[in-house]
C-alpha cells in the first residue's frame, strides 16, 4: 500500500495574480495534499488533492467611534519590525487565527509562504517549517531579514547570479535558486500567421497593474505612429481576454509587458523579443529585474511607457534582439521549486 503524501499549507498573497499563477505552475509537480490560504475567491477549478480556504481581508477600512479607519493608520509596521499587523483589525486577527487553527488541528509537514513576513513568522512560532518565496529588489529591511531568518528554505524564482542581493547572501545556505517559473514551460511555440511585412506587437499588462482605459489609449497612440505594425492588447481591463495567451505570446514578433517575475518567465518560455516597462512596486522589485534584463541584453527596457513617437525605434530595437533566454532557466523551474518544498516536508517523517 502506498503511503499518503505529506500535508502542505500554501499561503498565496492576494495582490495581483502573480502569486496564484506561480502556485498553479508548481502544484502539479508536488506529490502532497495541499491546503491553500488566500483572500482571493476559490478558482473555478483546482488540482487534485488541493483545498482552498478563503481568508478574511486585512486591508479594508474598519468602523470606529471616530469614523472609518484604514489599517495603514493603525501602526501596521510595529515601528518597522513587521510589514503588516494593524492594531484592532478583526480581519487581520481572523486571518491569522484561521491559519493557526488549521496548523494546530492538522499538523502540516511544511507551509509555503508566498509572500508574507507575518505568516512566515506565525508558521515558525507554531513549530512548522516555512518555505518562503522571495522576490527581487532591495529586501534588506528588518521585516525581510526576519522572514529569511525563520525560513527553513528560501525559494528564489530566478537563476543564480542574475540578481545580486546582500540580504539573500547572508542566508545563502538556505537559499535555492530554481530559475524563472512559467506556466508555459515546455510548451511548443505557435507558428505566427500574420500579414507579411507587418510586425505583430502584443501588449500584456502586468498582473498587478490597473491597465484600463489609459493603457488602451496609449496603445492606440502607439499604433497610430507605427503603421507597419499590428497591435493587440490582451487584458488590462479594456483589452481582449483569453484564458490561455500562449498562442498570442509565442507567435508575436514583439511583446510589450511589465517586469514581474511571471511576465519575465513567460517571455523566456516563449523566447520572445520584448520591450519591458517595469512598474513601480515595493522594494524596487520590477526596476531591479529591468536592470538585470537590460544588463543581459534579454529585452529592451524603458523606465516608463514611452511617448508615441518613440515606438518605431523601440520596435526596431526589440525586433533586432537575439535574446538568450536559456539564461533564465525556465525549463524545470517549477519542478525544482516543488522539490524544495518536498525536501522540507520530508523532515516530518524522520
Model-found features: residue ranges?
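A conserved, positively charged/aromatic
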Residues: 132, 145-156, 249
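A short, glycine/small-residue-rich beta-strand->loop->alpha-helix junction that serves as a flexible
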Residues: 10-24, 212-213
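A donor-sugar binding/catalytic signature common to diverse glycosyltransferases
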Residues: 110-115, 245-288
Amino acid at each position: 500500500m502506498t503511503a499518503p503524501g505529506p500535508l502542505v499549507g500554501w499561503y498565496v498573497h492576494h495582490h495581483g495574480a502573480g502569486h496564484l499563477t506561480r502556485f498553479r505552475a508548481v502544484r502539479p509537480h508536488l506529490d502532497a495534499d495541499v491546503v491553500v490560504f488566500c483572500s482571493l475567491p476559490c478558482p473555478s477549478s483546482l488540482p487534485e488533492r488541493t483545498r482552498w480556504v478563503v481568508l478574511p481581508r486585512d486591508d479594508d477600512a474598519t468602523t470606529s467611534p471616530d469614523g472609518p479607519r484604514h489599517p495603514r493608520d493603525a501602526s501596521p509596521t510595529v515601528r518597522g519590525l513587521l510589514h503588516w499587523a494593524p492594531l484592532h483589525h478583526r480581519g487581520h486577527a481572523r486571518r491569522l487565527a484561521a491559519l493557526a487553527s488549521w496548523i494546530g488541528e492538522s499538523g502540516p509537514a511544511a507551509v509555503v509562504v508566498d509572500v508574507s513576513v507575518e505568516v512566515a513568522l506565525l508558521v515558525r512560532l507554531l513549530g512548522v517549517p516555512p518555505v518562503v518565496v522571495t522576490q527581487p529588489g532591495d529586501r534588506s529591511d528588518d521585516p525581510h531579514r526576519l522572514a529569511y531568518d525563520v525560513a527553513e528554505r528560501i525559494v528564489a524564482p530566478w537563476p543564480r547570479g542574475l540578481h545580486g542581493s546582500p540580504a539573500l547572501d547572508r542566508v545563502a545556505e538556505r537559499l535555492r535558486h530554481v530559475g524563472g517559473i512559467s506556466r508555459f514551460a515546455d510548451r511548443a511555440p505557435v507558428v505566427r500567421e500574420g500579414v507579411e511585412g507587418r510586425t505583430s506587437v502584443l501588449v500584456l499588462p502586468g498582473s498587478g497593474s490597473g491597465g484600463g482605459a489609459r493603457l488602451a489609449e496609449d496603445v492606440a497612440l502607439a499604433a497610430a505612429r507605427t503603421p507597419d505594425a499590428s497591435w493587440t492588447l490582451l487584458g488590462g481591463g479594456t483589452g481582449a481576454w483569453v484564458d490561455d495567451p500562449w498562442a498570442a505570446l509565442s507567435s508575436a514578433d514583439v511583446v510589450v509587458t511589465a517586469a514581474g517575475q511571471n511576465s519575465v518567465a513567460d517571455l523566456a518560455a516563449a523566447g520572445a523579443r520584448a520591450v519591458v516597462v517595469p512598474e513601480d512596486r515595493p522594494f524596487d522589485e520590477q526596476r531591479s529585474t529591468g536592470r538585470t534584463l537590460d544588463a543581459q541584453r534579454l529585452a529592451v527596457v524603458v523606465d516608463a511607457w514611452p511617448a508615441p513617437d518613440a515606438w518605431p525605434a523601440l520596435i526596431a530595437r526589440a525586433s533586432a534582439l537575439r535574446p538568450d533566454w536559456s539564461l533564465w532557466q525556465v525549463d524545470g523551474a517549477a519542478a525544482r521549486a516543488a522539490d524544495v518544498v518536498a525536501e522540507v516536508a520530508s523532515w516530518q517523517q524522520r
